């Protein structure tokens, strides 16, 4: 499953993509808001 958070999507292997930036994430909380806003 995926969890949408702003522009980022946290996937089942705990990575999110915000634009061209990838970062680790947590399915419970999604991507960091600051990361999605900066990307």
Curated annotation (Swiss-Prot):
Cell compartments where the protein resides: Secreted
Any single biological process term in GO: defense response to bacterium
Protein source organism: Enterococcus faecium (Streptococcus faecium)
Any one GO cellular component localisation term in the record: extracellular region
Keyword Methyltransferase attributed: no
Coiled coil: none
Keyword Thylakoid: no
Protein name: Bacteriocin E50-52
Function: Bacteriocin active against the Gram-negative bacteria C.jejuni, Y.enterocolitica and Y.pseudotuberculosis, and the Gram-positive bacteria S.aureus, S.epidermidis, L.monocytogenes and Listeria spp. When added to the drinking water of chickens, causes a decrease in the levels of C.jejuni and S.enteritidis in the ceca, and in the levels of S.enteritidis in the liver and spleen.
Main location: secreted
Family recorded in the similarity comment: Belongs to the bacteriocin class IIA/YGNGV family.
Listed transmembrane segments: none
Keywords: Antibiotic, Antimicrobial, Bacteriocin, Secreted
